[in-house]
């Protein structure tokens, strides 16, 4: 039970206990060791209908389930003489204090303090008054919100609200990108980084380093951070663009066998990254800022890769030894199926070019239950679907 010395706390808030349902919610919290703070947090928790006696949970409910202005929970706190206790606990837990406290300024304090821990540069002077000395508690609180499947969308909405009020994008745009890499408080960080990445790629600056990260390393890192759910496809597209730009000065190998060997070892990646670039590009809501990069990727693929590779391939295929360079598609049945005793499924797909098969092969290799092999064969000419299917089936002539 509650010790006699804490009875004045109960008496001060006796109005709260006038309702049996409210009273029961308080006792359902099963507070083990009563003291003044636990009692006050318990009362606040009961008003918010929280399931645990936790001030962090009270603040979470107040911020995510209510409005920042005319908040219904704060009105309830005031009704039961708990509002001053709420703000005192905000100071105690989060270091937030104000002559006229408000949820708006509390929220800004939380986000600015969190940002200050991860941005390596000085924050704008106008933000300094919002930096709290209780950064550890604030980081733990916001981490729990942003990493929760239940509350991450609420976090994003609160983050966007603060970002708009503080004009965060403009503030970050004036900082070095190196100083922003570790921060994911606001989506604006990714917007600044993406803008910088586009400029580097369009300039073909593939050696750019940001805070120790190469362009693909930065893309991978940011895609795994909080806003990766929204920005992941953009970073994957930029990473594919990097792979294309890196091969801008392409030179084909000499001879069909050398061309094939190099394609199997490395050049297939050009086709693969080109496909992935457009796969992610086509999923973007807005592509306007990416048009110069798309044009560069298209130019490299068409005018520097294909324009160099295809003439070399066409010359090589006309050599006498061309059709002995690798196994032929028309020999597929005799080589793989005629004498096998196991049931075999053959999937024939026009879309499954070698680079697609290579990606599937890589995924199958990661499956411990699967044994995968990848080999190549030379298709028939002319290369069209019906003739290709016939070449894979038992036949005497084509």
Stretches found by the model and what they are:
Residues 350:
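Ligand-binding pocket scaffold of soluble enzyme catalytic domains
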Residues 1-344, 353-398:
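…; additionally, a secondary subgroup of soluble metalloenzymes is captured
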